[in-house]
């Protein structure tokens, strides 16, 4: 019936035209968003910057050349829906082993040992002042920016201004942007030399601007806190960060140990500290038969089993948790500790291997956590990540139910823990 086709096509065309007009009205163009950005700078940002003490000369000079960086992740431009987030519950949950890829660890250790020789005098002075061993600082430097070799392709002010205007965390980045303006106002670095990651982390230590203001130091004595091109300033700033977070002079980060089968793995965590001598009295011993340092025997020490009985086991000092202040991850702090030991002593990978826990999703672990919570256990946050509270609660539940504690989620527990 061809005579019905023309009105139908006309109606369809009209509908598509309406949708196109509606879409155009709902979603502003890039040019319009750029215009709104400029208005935001003068109307919203400047009053906040002025109140924070930023000079008008600095603000005008810096912000007149700032531009939106549309390449950044997780942007939420005005008039557009927020970016879709992949449900973290669908992320894979597996053994921590891949985090410690041996080829990478060896390469970083080799470079670290060479740099330890090159900067021996500087590192000695930093350790004398702050009490943080050089290998720890080198390990942080290597992990964060590959000893300064990683490219920082972003201008920090562009990144921070873009994120302050149209990201999902506008308030946070507005504060960081104003702190970046404080750094420029203080003449530590020029705006065009303030390079960062895509998240706005600055220089070789990867400090956010707020951390720079609090922890960066001028160690080479040139009058500027330069964490971009000055190695002494970068290393000393990291040392100052650790000290301000509680680093204890004269103590190591921790030791790989063997935990006897009769000693429960569900005793870990910073809230269950004991003198190292008390742990040793249970039969826990250092790998290789080495003695624990005498100065540590009466000092607070914690059990750490990042993969339960499926991987290496440790006794750690409070300095381990200070390393977590840099990045709140057990694996990150272990990476730094192991890399520092490789640089200092030529040691290798952990003695015990990382075991296979099967193939699971974070949603599987989250389900286990939720079940444990219903049974009265404290898992910390039920987020699908196996933190120390989840690990020890699993161990306690296993022991209570006649199972050998492993203190880590695995495929075999999915069916049992209901």
What label would you give each PLM region?
Residues 27-127:
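An acidic, Gly/Ser/Thr/Pro-rich helix-cap/linker signature
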Residues 1-11:
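Bacterial N-terminal signal peptides that target proteins for export
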Residues 317-329, 338-385:
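Acidic, Ser/Thr/Pro/Gly-enriched interdomain connector segments
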Residues 10-20:
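Bacterial N-terminal signal peptides
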Residues 88-243, 253:
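Acidic/His-rich structured neighborhood in mature extracellular/periplasmic domains
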Residues 42-59, 64-71, 128-131, 142-146, ...:
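Sec-exported extracytoplasmic/periplasmic mature domains
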Residues 191, 195-325, 333:
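Flexible, glycine-rich surface segments
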Residues 360-365, 373-417:
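Short acidic, glycine/serine/threonine-rich helix-capping segments at coil-helix boundaries
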């Amino acid at each position: 019936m061809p005579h019905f086709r023309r009105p139908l096509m006309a109606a369809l065309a009209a509908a598509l035209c309406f949708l196109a007009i509606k879409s155009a009205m709902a979603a502003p163009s890039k040019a319009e968003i750029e215009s709104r950005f400029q208005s935001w700078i003068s109307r919203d940002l400047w009053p906040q910057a002025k109140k924070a003490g930023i000079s008008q000369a600095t603000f005008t000079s810096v912000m007149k050349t700032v531009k939106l960086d549309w390449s950044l992740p997780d942007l939420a431009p005005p008039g557009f829906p927020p970016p879709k987030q992949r449900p973290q519950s669908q992320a894979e949950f597996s053994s921590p082993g891949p985090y410690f890829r041996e080829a990478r660890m060896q390469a970083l250790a080799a470079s670290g040992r060479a740099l330890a020789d090159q900067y021996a005098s500087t590192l000695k002075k930093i350790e004398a002042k702050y009490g943080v061993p050089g290998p720890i600082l080198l390990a942080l430097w290597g992990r964060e920016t590959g000893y300064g070799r990683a490219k920082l392709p972003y201008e920090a002010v562009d990144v921070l201004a873009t994120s302050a205007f149209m990201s999902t965390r506008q308030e946070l980045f507005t504060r960081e942007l104003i702190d970046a303006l404080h750094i420029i106002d203080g003449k530590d670095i020029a705006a065009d030399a303030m390079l960062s990651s895509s998240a706005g982390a600055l220089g070789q230590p990867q400090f956010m601007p707020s951390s720079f203001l609090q922890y960066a130091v001028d160690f080479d004595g040139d009058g500027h806190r330069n964490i971009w091109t000055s190695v002494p300033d970068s290393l000393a700033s990291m040392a100052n960060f650790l000290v301000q977070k509680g680093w204890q002079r004269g103590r190591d980060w921790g030791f790989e140990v063997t935990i006897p089968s009769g000693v429960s793995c569900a005793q870990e965590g910073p809230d269950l500290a004991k003198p190292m001598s008390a742990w040793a009295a249970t039969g826990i011993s250092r790998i290789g038969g080495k003695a624990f340092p005498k100065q540590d025997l009466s000092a607070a020490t914690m059990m750490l089993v990042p993969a339960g009985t499926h991987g290496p086991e440790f006794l750690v000092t409070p300095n381990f948790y200070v390393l977590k202040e840099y990045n709140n991850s057990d694996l990150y702090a272990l990476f730094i500790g192991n890399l520092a030991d490789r640089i200092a002593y030529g040691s290798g990978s952990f003695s015990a291997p990382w075991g296979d826990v099967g193939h699971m999703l974070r949603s599987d672990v989250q389900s286990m956590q939720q079940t444990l919570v219903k049974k009265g256990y404290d898992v910390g946050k039920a987020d699908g990540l196996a933190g120390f509270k989840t690990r020890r609660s699993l161990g306690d539940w296993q022991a209570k139910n006649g199972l050998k504690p492993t203190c880590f989620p695995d495929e075999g527990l999915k069916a049992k823990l209901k």
